[in-house]
Amino acid sequence: MVTALIKGEIDAFIVFEPYPFLATEEIGEEKVNVFSEPDLYGETWNIVIMDEFNNENKGTVFKFINALVKAEQYLNENPKESLEIVAKNTGLDVDVVSGIMKKQNFGVVLNNELIGYLKEEAIWAIKQGLSSSNEIPNYIDVINREYLLEINPEAVTI
């Protein structure tokens, strides 16, 4: 996509990182307009498991969430090493990874921002006719806070 933009074959494209960063580096900030949060939307990566799996595998779920919290701590305490790990595993240059990661907010959290995003998506789905219901779910009722409350209670603000 970046090459097509440089050649003038396209006027715009919609992609995830690293391509917006690479386009800006290649073409220059003055010629590239990258729309990102809060301009368009926020992005979260959520863990979703079925109740049955959770009930049968509580130890595994706890270990998984604990590993994510430890990874977050490592990232915060070792930013240089974290960049090198991501660069090695993605094949991207450390400078590219650094430019991308500076824009990110890494955290294992349950907060009101997540609830807001879920409600916005529900409203969108209802308007698009993608939902069999016209009611926005009460997401507080379906979000399991028990593991994160045990591991890192400060991360739970909902």
Residue ranges with predicted function:
Residues 34-37, 53-55, 116-120, 150-158:
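Short, structured secondary-structure boundary patches
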Residues 56-132:
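Secondary-structure end/capping motifs
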